[in-house]
Amino acid sequence: MELQWYVGLDWGKSEHQVCLLNATGEHIAERKISHTGSGFTELTTWLSEQTNQAETASIGVALETSSGPVVDCLLALGYGVFAINPKQADRFRDRYSPAGAKDDRRDALVLATALFLEPQALRLLEAPDSDMLELRERHRMREQLQRTKQGLALKIRQCLWSYYPDFESLFGSDLGLPFVQAIWEHMPNPEAAQRRRKHSVEKSLKAHKIRRFQADQILQQLRAERLPVATTTARLLQEQITLLFQQLALVQQQLQEVMHQLETKLESLSTQAPTTNTSSTNPPRPTDRDILASMPGVGIFVLANLLGEAGVVIRNRDYAALRCLAGIAPVTKKSGKSCRVQRRRAANPRLVDSMYHWARVASQVDPICRQRYEALRTRGHTHGRALRSVADRLLAVACAMLKAGTLYRRTAAET
């Protein structure tokens, strides 16, 4: 439905400024709403009154973000939601105040006017389906837990370095393993290691199926003389490390649960019944999940991130939007005889990270990707730039496969 009403919403943490224009661009009304359930109910009632009970699909809302609770609420209410880049909004604002004056009311008016004058410059947002939304949120939970785990491990290493450096040098990179936490419970200091028997350490190694370490090696290093720090300092650090290990064990358990849920969800997407080509003469059309999973270099986390963060773009088979969203499309700055091609910085950081790992692994396992990567490196391209070029090709192939509904065919050299 064609837009008849234009709303600018300058969002904030506790309050949002709203400005309403009609079909001719005339300023109708403005107000503030609170960031609460009742606040959005008031917004719906107010817009209905001001627009003479117009349908929500005929009302467009422009704001300077493409995600978050405000966007989710507006999409759920049925409004057309348009996102504008903050840099674009700054240029629109300069039309009204070259001096740079800025306030919430002016920003809301600028957003509404931008949607009225140049709707093609804004991006229409679509609500992701429940599967893509679940993948996105679960993958973000995994990333957050992974960062928490790394932070706890760094704190433990710092405390160990302060009074028990032998333990840190032996297990510093493996602190998240249950085996290391079991060793700490029995040998939190050199004195406890002196009392520990070789047989008990071997039993612990066998119980956790650890072969990289030997009991003699562990006991020899942990029984070494400790740093000459005060007894009280050592005791308090030991208590702190014990608490950190307990937190680390909990985070590790939660991380495994989230990863299992992520794998289960991806598996369910693969087993969903296709909606086309279900006749007996034609094979069933593979799902988007199966098509992307067949690509070289795509693992569980890359697949979940692609479907979760770019699910709408993938559903629309929009290659140009996907390469911009993933930071693959370069930025060209040309003026006169000067022409510079730069890396795109305005992109989804999670997709940028996934593209890097996708291209990196594909360059290792796929002969075509490896050949392309080596050719670019020979021409003097940096590692990152070569990988972005490989990722660009992979995205083009993936979009073509999604349109055709075919799986990636590996060469004989790969198999």
Indicate where each model-derived feature is located.
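A detector of single, family-specific signature residues
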Residues: 1-415
